[in-house]
Curated annotation (Swiss-Prot):
Organism for this UniProt entry: Aquifex aeolicus (strain VF5)
Compartments where found: Cytoplasm
Lineage of the organism: Bacteria, Pseudomonadati, Aquificota, Aquificia, Aquificales
Residue spans crossing the bilayer: none
Family per similarity comment: Belongs to the IF-3 family.
GO cellular component, one term: cytosol
UniProt xrefs under InterPro entries: T_IF-3_C_sf, T_IF-3_N_sf, Translation_initiation_fac3_CS, Translation_initiation_fac_3, Translation_initiation_fac_3_C, Translation_initiation_fac_3_N
Name of the protein in question: Translation initiation factor IF-3
Gene3D superfamilies assigned: Translation initiation factor 3 (IF-3), C-terminal domain, Translation initiation factor 3 (IF-3), N-terminal domain
Biological function: IF-3 binds to the 30S ribosomal subunit and shifts the equilibrium between 70S ribosomes and their 50S and 30S subunits in favor of the free subunits, thus enhancing the availability of 30S subunits on which protein synthesis initiation begins.
Amino acid sequence: MSKLKEYRVNRQIRAKECRLIDENGQQIGIVPIEEALKIAEEKGLDLVEIAPQAKPPVCKIMDYGKFKYELKKKEREARKKQREHQIEVKDIRMKVRIDEHDLQVKLKHMREFLEEGDKVKVWLRFRGRENIYPELGKKLAERIINELSDIAEVEVQPKKEGNFMIFVLAPKRKK
C-alpha cells in the first residue's frame, strides 16, 4: 500500500563522512559520521541519510518518527486529491417509452451527476417492436440533450447498438 522510501537512520548509515544539516535546516558542513551521530544523540534526535547518492551523502538531524509521519500524511493528501479529481462515468438506463415523471427523475439524477463533474452514459433500451422505430430513441435523446444543454455537452453522439441507443454527456467546461 505505502510506497514510502526507506531511509538509513543512525548506525545504518555506512558512509565515513556526510554533509550534515541540523534540525533547523542550517548546513553544518562535511563532518565524520561518528561526530554527526554524537551531535544528533546529544540533541535527542536521529541522524537520517536524506540523499545517499550524493558525494558525500547528505544527512539531516531530525526526529525520524515525526519525519515518517509527515511523509505518510503528505502521501495520504496526494491520494485524496487524486481521488477527488477522478471523473467517473455514471450509467443511466431507461426504456424508449419512458413515462414523463420517470424521465424527470432520470433527468434530475443526470443533472446531479453532471454537476458533480461526472460524465453520464445514457442507455435507451428498445424492446420488441420498438426496434423498428429508432426515431423514438432519437427524439428522446434529443430531448434529454436539450434539457441538459445548460450544464452538459454531448461527448459521444447517440448511436444505435443492438437493442440500445447509447450516448455520453460530459459536464460543460468552465471558461
